[in-house]
Amino acid sequence: GEPVTVLQYWGHGSPGTVWLAGNPIPTAEWLSLKPLLIPESLVWLRICSAFQGRVGQVFAKQMADGLGCTIGAHTYIIGLFQGGLHTMKPNSMPSWDAAEGTEVKWRPDFQPWLPHSILCLQWWIPKGW
């Protein structure tokens, strides 16, 4: 079959973790998707805080290197506006500050001025993010 070029997962997250039905999805489960992807693929985790903190940066690197494609996710709690959107390519290092998203415990989702924010209806990641 055809490779998957874009995979978006909408759900719940926390730093370095993707959740499904109240349970974390192990990184190894995500890495099992590699045969379906190509280097030009994008796996976009539209969940809260997955790339937040050092643990989020380690997760981003594991996912990008392990899947061999670009990974996108957020450093902030998201809602209508989705802030802290960053991407990570294989064999690279995180380009965002590990403290991004950690300075406040809770923020309403209506904050389009947060770094790297998009509206939830946007289906592409701006170039360079």
Residue ranges and their predicted role:
Residues 1-17, 120, 127-129:
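Glycine-rich short-loop/terminal segments
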Residues 6-83:
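Catalytic cores of nucleophile-dependent amide-cleaving enzymes
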Residues 73-129:
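Caspase-like cysteine protease fold
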